[in-house]
């Protein structure tokens, strides 16, 4: 896994943009402002690392964020209070499985240290077959004993099952 420091200016611009816009375009489980902030910040960090401009646009993106390695890719970012570990999981909302996307790039943001981590990537078929699936409403426990209730059908894949990405 590779880490990068998040520029304060990008954080500020992302938060300000989200005050008047929403990234949620599904019929359910669109994420809170904080979750949308983490997602957009992660997507734009990945874009910048790959010498692409940051993107702040309204409307549905068609299910993918960018072209990467010749495929339609979606950047999925989780906010955490710690650095990611190989056994930590990445979440994929089941409502998105029919979107036009071929590749998923999983990232994490340590909110306490403003560090962006690229955890790895996988293709859609591998994600759907190698993940653990949980129904909406199921209780999910974390390493520290805390839990959350799934707001949507959820696939979880461990960082250790992802392909490594060197940029």
Where are these regions (language model features)?
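Nucleic-acid endonuclease domains
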Residues: 1-69, 76-167
């Amino acid at each position: 896994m590779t880490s990068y420091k998040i520029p304060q200016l990008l954080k500020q611009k992302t938060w300000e943009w989200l005050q008047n816009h929403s990234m949620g375009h599904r019929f359910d489980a669109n994420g809170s402002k904080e979750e949308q902030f983490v997602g957009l910040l992660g997507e734009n960090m990945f874009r910048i690392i790959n010498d692409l401009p940051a993107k702040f646009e309204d409307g549905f993106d068609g299910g993918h964020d960018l072209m990467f390695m010749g495929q339609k890719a979606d950047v999925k970012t989780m906010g955490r209070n710690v650095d990611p570990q190989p056994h930590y999981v990445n979440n994929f909302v089941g409502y998105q499985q029919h979107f036009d996307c071929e590749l998923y790039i999983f990232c994490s943001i340590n909110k306490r240290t403003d560090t962006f981590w690229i955890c790895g990537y996988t293709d859609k078929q591998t994600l759907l077959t190698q993940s653990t699936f949980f129904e909406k409403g199921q209780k999910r426990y974390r390493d520290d004993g805390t839990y959350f209730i799934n707001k949507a059908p959820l696939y979880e894949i461990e960082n250790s099952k992802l392909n490594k990405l060197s940029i």
